[in-house]
């Protein structure tokens, strides 16, 4: 008996063009989506095929008439600004009718799920908090102004589409009440007897997500709700461990809570969605960071938002998907850096020469981008 005969006949097959051998086949469930290879991530349809699967809508639903409220972490501000510049109706813009609301002025600083929940509880449920919790980025204390509460309520009730971005699970809270601050505690008011740093747990964040969903559905039952997770890492941790490992834990807690919440709730709520901005940035692009290793390269951000626009928004996007993809790949080392500048300046022959020794997939990608950009010119 030859070695391996007891395991059954040797099966030979290919996966993504690579030869494979096995003595057994395995039942992999009703849904089986393989992790992409690096080659899989070269093509312009990489994000559509390997990241958005299971999360994309059947058809674009955001039109210029859709009322949008977007807040949470700093990544929510990118979404708000992008959509507003393209004449979509973002209600909580600083220069808009509800520009005095905290979700307009400081929405990018509400990065933990407690801070997001507080805005819904305060504005829609009239909840009062025992402590003053809200400091802006300049450490100025913001009070529970009734006029601002009513403006926030009006904006939230007018919204057709909520985009809520979570950023971190590390929080500062009041020891006596357990209530959580927007941000860290300003140095001049910090009191170790009153203020406590901690990492909010998976169960806490899951509970907060459920409460946010419950309140929205109570007051605005037909609105669409989208959650996202910001890829922007912690600037620092207050834990006695490295910031890199603390950030990994912080994002994992939030992503796990989101996944459990969405898995349980989406089957019963067709208007509940997730946009995988975190996965696009972290898994698709390699050299994604600016030199400070916190800010995402603008070309990558623009690609994430261009993809969002192609998937979610009606009308013709400002930038073609192949164009945005090539631009981001040039900025992150996936293509020669000069390729996009050649395309942008109309030096199409130079762009083709720059990738002449690259793979067929990359040459085809540059050709697609060239055709898109030529169509915009004429």
List each model region and its residues.
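Extracellular glycan-modifying ectodomains
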Residues: 1-378
């Amino acid at each position: 008996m030859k070695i391996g005969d007891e395991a059954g006949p040797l099966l030979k097959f290919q996966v993504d063009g690579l030869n494979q051998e096995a003595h057994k086949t395995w039942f992999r469930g009703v849904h089986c989506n393989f992790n992409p290879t690096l080659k899989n991530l070269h093509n312009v349809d990489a994000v559509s095929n390997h990241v958005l699967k299971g999360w994309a809508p059947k058809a674009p639903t955001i039109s210029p008439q859709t009322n949008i409220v977007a807040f949470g972490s700093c990544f929510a501000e990118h979404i708000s600004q992008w959509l507003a510049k393209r004449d979509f109706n973002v209600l909580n813009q600083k220069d808009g009718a509800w520009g005095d609301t905290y979700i307009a002025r400081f929405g990018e600083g509400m990065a933990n799920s407690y801070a997001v929940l507080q805005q819904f509880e305060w504005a829609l449920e009239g909840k009062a908090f025992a402590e003053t919790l809200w400091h802006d980025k300049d450490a100025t204390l913001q009070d529970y102004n009734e006029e601002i509460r009513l403006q926030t309520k009006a904006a939230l009730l007018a919204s057709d589409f909520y985009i809520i971005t979570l950023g971190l699970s590390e929080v500062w809270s009041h020891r006596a009440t357990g209530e959580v601050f927007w941000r860290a505690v300003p140095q001049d008011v910090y009191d170790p007897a009153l203020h406590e740093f901690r990492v909010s747990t998976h169960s806490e964040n899951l509970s907060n997500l459920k409460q946010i969903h419950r309140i929205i559905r109570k007051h605005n039952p037909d609105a669409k709700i989208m959650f996202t997770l910001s890829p922007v890492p912690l600037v620092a941790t207050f834990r006695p461990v490295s910031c890199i490992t603390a950030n990994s834990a912080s994002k994992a807690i939030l992503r796990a809570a989101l996944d459990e919440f969405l898995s349980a709730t989406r089957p019963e709520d067709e208007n509940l969605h997730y946009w995988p901005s975190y996965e696009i940035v972290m898994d698709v692009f390699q050299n994604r960071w600016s030199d400070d290793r916190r800010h995402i390269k603008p070309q990558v951000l623009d690609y994430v938002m261009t993809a969002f626009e192609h998937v979610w928004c009606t009308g013709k996007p400002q930038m073609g998907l192949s164009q945005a993809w090539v631009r981001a790949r040039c900025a992150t080392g996936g293509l020669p850096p000069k390729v996009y500048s050649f395309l942008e300046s109309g030096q199409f022959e130079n762009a083709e020469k720059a990738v002449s020794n690259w793979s067929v997939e990359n040459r085809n990608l540059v050709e697609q981008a060239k055709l898109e950009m030529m169509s915009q010119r004429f």
